Amino acid sequence: MSELISHRPSVEKDLKKAVGGIITDWSIGAGFRVQTDKVAAGRTTDHTFDYVAIDTSNVIAVNILAPGSGGLARAQRYGFQSLDLETTREGRWKKLAILSRPDDWSYDARALVKKFAQSVVDFHNPQSDRDTVQLSLEELRRAA
């Protein structure tokens, strides 16, 4: 049963690997170390960030969000994660949401994600969006 619950389609795994490569490449020059699948304890449940980039004064939490059917349910889960972690150390981390298949996200779902992430990136493919992801990470690093 746990295999079914934790199942991620191959496309999502490929996307996560591609984004991970982009984040790792950026982190080397920026002086960050990267952790994968970082678990954070919320008030009601545990949550997992796909990537967390850490340096001496910053933590940037990255979630790769797939829209499913219009994205609203996924956006609501992302919002719940933010609210559940709000009073924790992890709740103070800077948040980057990467939206896969950006054309499939409804306006309401996209707006909800933007309420909880400091930066949102539309991700079409690794070649065209590499610079956008790295620029967003850099902007979050520099933000006070």
Q: Which residues make up each language-model segment?
A:
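Domain-level recognition of nuclease-like catalytic cores that cleave nucleotide substrates
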Residues: 98-144
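Hydrophobic/aromatic residues located in beta-strands of well-ordered beta-sheets
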Residues: 94-96
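Acidic-basic catalytic patches of nuclease active cores, encompassing PD-(D/E)XK
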Residues: 2-37, 144
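A short, glycine/Asx- and small/polar-enriched loop/turn
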Residues: 45-48
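Active-site-adjacent loop/helix micro-motif of nuclease/hydrolase catalytic cores
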Residues: 68-81, 105-108
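Structural motif
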Residues: 39, 64-68, 98-102
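Arginine/glycine-rich "motif VI" loop of SF2 helicases in the C-terminal RecA-like domain
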Residues: 85-92
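Active-site beta-strand-loop-beta-strand hairpin of nuclease catalytic cores
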Residues: 52-62
